[in-house]
């Protein structure tokens, strides 16, 4: 059974972060991670042709695929120390620090805010920095 479906409360923020990161690493399709009406807001200039604010899993998957095509070997990971603010027993906001490494191009760090409802991400705000920052301890 899906660990998020079993425990969609404050106990499971790392599971959401893991699925979100796996999606960016193309280990899970966006259709298994985000809701049909999920919007993703990026806080940086586009690096690939993409919608300004992708809507739903199909558009988000297209963004992920375009990035992976342009930057082969790109790898995302997140800091295991996440922050969680519940709205209810089945929804809340997760804050995570992440970094992305591109072979031959170094590492960048970012912050994502993920809103979830049940087992799906319903909204995301993603900010990428130009410098690598240390993870929180």
Regions from the PLM with identified roles:
Residues 1-137:
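C-terminal and inter-domain tail/linker signature
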